[in-house]
């Protein structure tokens, strides 16, 4: 599967009356665990890269990491930049 948009995942969740977990990623191990668990449970997941993660992992690396996990998963994976502090982060 490819990266899913937050809008499509939340619309589906609202329509079918379920919540979607938004999980803060601190590194590769967390992200992989969240993606694998979402696939095992057959649910979507929102991977959130917050300031702590971005302090140690450059955005281009995070982007490739999230994209790789989404492509390997049969579950929808949303990539979310959590708490962008300035336009430079966008």
PLM features: residue spans?
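Generic hydrophobic/packing signal
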Residues: 70-73, 81-85
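Glycine-/small-residue-rich active-site loops that bind phosphorylated ligands and cofactors
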Residues: 54, 85-86
């Amino acid at each position: 599967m490819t990266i899913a948009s937050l809008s499509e995942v939340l619309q589906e969740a609202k329509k079918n009356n379920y919540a979607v977990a938004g999980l803060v990623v601190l590194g590769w191990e967390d992200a992989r665990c969240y993606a694998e668990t979402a696939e095992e449970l057959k649910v979507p997941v929102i991977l959130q890269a917050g300031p702590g993660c971005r302090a140690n992992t450059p955005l281009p690396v995070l982007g490739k990491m999230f994209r790789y996990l989404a492509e390997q998963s049969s579950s929808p994976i949303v990539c979310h930049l959590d708490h962008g502090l300035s336009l430079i982060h966008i």
